[in-house]
């Protein structure tokens, strides 16, 4: 691969005269400009966008590298023809000779064009996971493929590098069978690690070796559909497992507490490209006692799809509850019913 960025201006002049840009000579070598299209590998979606669905937004920008010299070239998505074009025409990627070249791409792009960015330091916080716009910066996407001068039209199939967790609260009933009205819910996910890295060259996101076990907090309301959503670094869950803790103040000013303990045997890890979705049914037992959240069924689908149904017995606070993790690759949906603490 030759570094031909400095010759792109000449190519542009040649294009004016020849009317097409797939047979231009650079210092005696024929070159072909690479064209890019892209898709996001995800099976299921509710909110269709570059980070949660299967389409790109017009104007989205990615980084593409080809071979040993054309590194970190920024391309912008054009919705009209489902293609990416170089932001800087002088830096667009061309292929010379008959070799096969490795092509990699990642989103969102960082650093400067022409230089390989360092491994990115990642810190997940309650603040940077609070809204879809803030979370978008942490849903890293990565693609890799091959390209030749004979086959310069390259399709990039992006995969999610992170794990995703969705905790959706739905209204249950009170002791008389009346529906519960959901108000603001304060929700915590406890037992996760929040610090690590994303390697733009390999597409691997990982927790740091010394990352501490921590928690994340979100306030849930009608604006976010009472759904706690975070992007997390793929990781092995610690021996203590995970806990979901929540509290809601009722219309008559009572405070209802919810709790779910997920043992590590049921959810041992979070995998890249997997979304783990839990549906939590918020009942009101008309008491001040904390309420244990219990699982009544599961539905697993990667950002591959596996379905599961369970009807566990009611358990007291601190006892096990089934909540099997699986494959965004695979999403996991858990239906959970709270029972009054004994």
What do these predicted ranges mean?
Residues 2-6, 15-342:
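Sec-type signal peptide cleavage vicinity
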């Amino acid at each position: 691969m030759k570094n031909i960025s400095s010759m792109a201006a000449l190519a542009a002049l040649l294009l004016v005269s020849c009317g097409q840009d797939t047979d231009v000579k650079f210092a005696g070598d024929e070159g072909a400009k690479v064209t890019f299209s892209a898709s996001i590998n995800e099976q299921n979606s509710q909110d269709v966008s570059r980070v949660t669905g299967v389409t790109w937004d017009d104007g989205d920008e990615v980084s593409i590298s080809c071979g040993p010299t054309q590194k970190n070239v920024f391309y912008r998505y054009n919705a009209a023809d489902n293609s990416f074009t170089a932001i800087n025409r002088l830096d667009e990627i061309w292929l010379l000779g008959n070799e096969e070249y490795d092509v990699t791409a990642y989103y969102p792009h960082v650093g400067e064009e022409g230089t390989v960015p360092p491994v990115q330091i990642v810190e997940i916080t309650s603040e940077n996971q609070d809204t879809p716009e803030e979370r978008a910066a942490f849903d890293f996407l990565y693609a890799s493929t091959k390209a030749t001068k004979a086959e310069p039209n390259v399709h990039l199939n992006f995969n999610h590098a992170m794990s995703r967790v969705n905790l959706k609260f739905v209204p249950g009933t009170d002791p008389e069978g009346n529906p519960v009205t959901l108000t603001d819910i304060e929700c915590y996910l406890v037992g996760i690690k929040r610090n690590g890295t994303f390697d733009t060259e390999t597409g691997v996101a990982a927790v740091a070796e010394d990352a501490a076990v921590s928690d994340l907090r979100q306030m849930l309301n009608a604006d976010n559909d009472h759904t706690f959503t975070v992007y997390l670094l793929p990781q092995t869950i610690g021996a203590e497992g995970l806990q979901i803790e929540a509290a809601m103040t009722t219309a008559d000013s009572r405070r209802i507490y919810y709790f779910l303990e997920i043992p590590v045997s049921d959810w041992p890890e979070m995998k890249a490209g997997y979304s783990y979705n839990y549906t939590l049914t918020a009942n009101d037992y008309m008491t001040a006692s904390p309420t244990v959240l219990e699982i009544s069924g599961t539905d697993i689908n990667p950002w591959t799809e596996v379905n599961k149904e369970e009807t566990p017995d009611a358990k007291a606070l601190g006892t096990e509850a089934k909540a099997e993790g699986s494959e965004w690759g695979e999403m996991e949906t858990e239906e959970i019913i709270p029972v009054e603490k004994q």
